[in-house]
Amino acid sequence: MHCPFCSATDTKVIDSRLVAEGHQVRRRRECTECHERFTTFEGAELVMPRVIKRDGSRQPFDEEKLQGGMLRAVEKRPVSMDEIEQALSKIKSTLRATGEREVPSEMVGNLMMEQLMSLDKVAYIRFASVYRAFEDVSEFGEAIAKLQK
């Protein structure tokens, strides 16, 4: 690790501890040249799979797009940002756990609907109506009937 003060290449670790619920390591370091101290954080780089769109094109996973879709679905509903962040985290964890380099967009959409169903039924119907491209009232009725089972 290079010293951010003098650019020396030799630093020593003085203290290490787990932070962020064990997902990161915080290290206190000291430069052996200038004796300045600084802190570094180390965490695993988790790569999200690429998304295969319905038209066959592929694009990188876009967390902002996922969050935007969820925020639109829960707009003006009694759902906290913590609940939204937890749901998004579950979706990302599930996608990473597949171990696949690419996942179909249908999988992402279905995971989103699962999370919305447990968060807020109205938000689920909102998202499903757009995602499944409902064309008439009967399709809304079918989705609502599915919720009542």
UniProtKB/Swiss-Prot annotation:
Assigned keywords, A-Z: ATP-binding, DNA-binding, Metal-binding, Nucleotide-binding, Repressor, Transcription, Transcription regulation, Zinc, Zinc-finger
InterPro entries for the chain: ATP-cone_dom, NrdR-like_N, RNR_NrdR-like
GO molecular function annotation: ATP binding; DNA binding; zinc ion binding
Domain of life per record: Bacteria
Zinc finger (unnamed): 3-34
Record flagged with keyword Signal: no
Cofactor: Zn(2+)
Zinc-finger listed as a keyword: yes
Transmembrane segments: none
Stretches assigned to the ATP-cone domain: 49-139
GO BP terms, alphabetized: negative regulation of DNA-templated transcription
S-S bonds: none
Free-text remark on how the cofactor is bound: Binds 1 zinc ion.
Record-linked PROSITE patterns: ATP_CONE
Known role: Negatively regulates transcription of bacterial ribonucleotide reductase nrd genes and operons by binding to NrdR-boxes.
Cross-referenced HAMAP family: NrdR
Family recorded in the similarity comment: Belongs to the NrdR family.
Protein name: Transcriptional repressor NrdR
